[in-house]
């Protein structure tokens, strides 16, 4: 039984990490052709998002500038103007294709996220015994660490999350989440989240140290404050 208890967390962790990713990737590949066919036949506007709309507007502004350039060079030969209009037409067609492709990817990414969330929720509900074993394994692992290693780990984690260079990492992660879910890239919202998350995490950490660590391991708190200073 102890051997089974020791080996259980590793396949369970591996399945949590790789199984949702593998299933969602397979679902993505198998559903891609159907979504492309459905989108091309229906051309629904339901999934229009601000990110793609902004890109389309930027590209159409460029095309408008080309049309203004066309008006300025009317003294050129008709052949030259005809070639210019053909080029603008091809660029417009390419823009529409890119717009549709981005919408298709948005639908697939959204479906993949739902699948991953569903699988992880099923793990948390059905794998209660494995979660208990994993929790006991983590507690035993942390208990065997020295107070110096624990303090160093806490200090390293806090510096990564709320350190001097942490806003760059938060900005990157929030931007990836926005892009993955199709939200509009708003600099004000991202700046607000980047400035808020580290403060919240710092407050929670200080409360945890004051309420929990002071009671469980006062020596760890002393070492942590000494290393932090």
UniProtKB/Swiss-Prot annotation:
Give the source's domain of life in one word: Eukaryota
Name the principal localization, coarsely classed.
plastid
Single Gene Ontology BP annotation:
potassium ion transport
> Which organism does this sequence originate in?
Illicium oligandrum
Molecular function GO terms recorded: antiporter activity; proton transmembrane transporter activity
What is the name attached to this protein's record? Potassium/proton antiporter CemA
A Pfam family recorded for this sequence: CemA
**Which InterPro entries does the entry mention?**
CemA
Sorted alphabetically, which keywords does the UniProt record give? Antiport, Chloroplast, Hydrogen ion transport, Ion transport, Membrane, Plastid, Plastid inner membrane, Potassium, Potassium transport, Transmembrane, Transmembrane helix, Transport
What reaction(s) does this enzyme catalyze? K(+)(in) + H(+)(out) = K(+)(out) + H(+)(in)
Q: Where in the cell is it found?
A: Plastid, Chloroplast inner membrane
Record function comment: Contributes to K(+)/H(+) antiport activity by supporting proton efflux to control proton extrusion and homeostasis in chloroplasts in a light-dependent manner to modulate photosynthesis. Prevents excessive induction of non-photochemical quenching (NPQ) under continuous-light conditions. Indirectly promotes efficient inorganic carbon uptake into chloroplasts.
Q: Where is the signal peptide?
A: none
Topology relative to the membrane: Multi-pass membrane protein
Note whether Metal-binding occurs among the keywords: no
Under the heading HAMAP family, the entry gives: CemA_PxcA
| Gene Ontology cellular component annotations, sorted alphabetically | chloroplast inner membrane
Q: Which family does it belong to?
A: Belongs to the CemA family.
Query: What residue intervals traverse the membrane?
Result: 7-27, 106-126, 193-213
């Amino acid at each position: 039984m102890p051997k089974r208890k020791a080996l259980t967390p590793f396949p369970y962790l591996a399945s949590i990490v790789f199984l949702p990713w593998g299933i969602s990737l397979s679902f993505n590949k198998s559903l891609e052709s159907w979504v492309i066919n459905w989108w091309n036949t229906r051309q629904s506007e339901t999934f229009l998002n601000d990110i793609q709309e902004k890109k389309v507007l930027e590209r159409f502004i460029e095309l408008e500038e080309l049309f203004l350039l066309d008006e300025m060079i009317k003294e050129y030969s008709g052949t030259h103007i005809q070639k210019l209009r053909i080029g603008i037409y091809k660029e417009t067609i390419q823009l529409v294709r890119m717009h549709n492709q981005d919408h298709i990817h948005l639908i697939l990414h959204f479906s993949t996220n739902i699948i991953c969330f569903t699988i992880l929720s099923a793990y948390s509900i059905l794998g209660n015994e494995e979660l208990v074993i994993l929790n006991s394994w983590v507690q035993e692992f942390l208990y065997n660490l020295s107070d110096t290693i624990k303090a160093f780990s806490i200090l390293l984690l806090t510096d990564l999350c709320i350190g001097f260079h942490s806003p760059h990492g938060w900005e990157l992660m929030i931007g990836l989440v926005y892009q993955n879910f199709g939200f509009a890239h708003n600099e004000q919202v991202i700046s607000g989240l980047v400035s808020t998350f580290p403060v919240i995490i710092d407050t929670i950490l200080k409360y945890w140290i004051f309420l929990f660590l002071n009671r469980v391991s006062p020596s760890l708190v002393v070492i942590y404050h000494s290393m932090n200073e």
